[in-house]
Regions:
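N-terminal leader/targeting pre-sequences
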Residues: 2, 6, 15-162
Length: 162
């Protein structure tokens, strides 16, 4: 298995879409993304590790994000590009290769960049493990997420805007 650890640092997006942490994906059939703080929140203790593992039909996405405000909820998305620069704007919108609508993770018609919202426990840690059947780690696949940004947003997801 090829495990590659990549990280990127980004600053704040425009006021309503500030990033808490960001990382870029690389490698396959399993890849580990290290989330590191952005300049959006100072000081910013947000850090995390997310593993994407290829399955026969989809990808297992599992990991842990630390340094969140206890009890807080955060939007969590795969973005179009793997660049977290230019105040986070370089990552583009949510990954959406089929032009689907923005909605909840695994809901019919939802776009491929949608991941479950992160909810921090009393210690400020969000742990998750889900099967995502809308993404792939396969070269050439339209829904391949390798090389894209993984973003923990400062605020909760409204399931409408990007």
């Amino acid at each position: 298995m090829n495990h590659r650890r990549l990280s990127a640092i980004a600053a704040a997006l425009a006021a309503s879409a500030v990033l808490a942490a960001c990382g870029s994906m690389g490698g396959k059939p399993s890849t580990v993304v290290e989330l590191v703080p952005t300049g959006a929140i100072t000081p910013n203790p947000t850090r995390g590790t997310v593993t994407f593992t290829a399955l026969d039909h989809g990808v297992r996405v599992s990991g842990e994000v630390r340094g969140l405000v206890p009890g807080s909820e955060h939007g969590f998305h795969i973005h179009e590009k793997g660049d977290c620069g230019n105040n986070g704007d370089a990552s583009g919108g949510h990954f959406n290769p089929t032009g689907a609508t923005h909605g909840k993770f695994a809901a019919p018609g939802s776009h491929a960049g949608e991941l479950p919202s992160l909810v921090a426990d009393a210690g400020g840690v969000a742990r998750f493990s889900v099967e995502d059947h809308s993404i792939s780690l396969t070269d050439g696949a339209v829904n391949n997420v390798i090389g894209r940004a993984l973003i923990v947003h400062r605020d909760r997801d409204d399931f409408t805007t990007q």
